[in-house]
């Protein structure tokens, strides 16, 4: 019996390794990894450039608090800001943490311009944003929120593809 929490209905497939966009099961079958580890493996499996960067950094520092200056973090933030719309970067540990940061940033923005009551966020019903309290309520999924009351308020939901419902 597995000691892992039963938060997924696991398939009876076990993977031993991956290469690029493909996964290889323990019985030797090749699969296209269209899920990409729930969208976290965008560079593919066993990416040689990523392996090299991880190995190089692991020999220096693993992590220190963001209360300190980390030269490699500064360098990466500069590169990302230069190639995107962003003026500054905040690194997050997960998609849920990034979503929480986006919720807070949106609410703080309207608070800072004197519109604190403008705090509701539109979300696609039955979407997935993570497993924190705020992100499960952002999902609009009864299955995900059942038993986790009281409700985290501030989210309005619309059906995916139903543009008319956005006018409400």
Regions found by a protein language model. Name each.
Residues 25-26:
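Short, acidic, Ser/Thr-enriched surface-loop or helix-capping motifs
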Residues 78-168:
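PLP-dependent aspartate aminotransferase-fold enzymes
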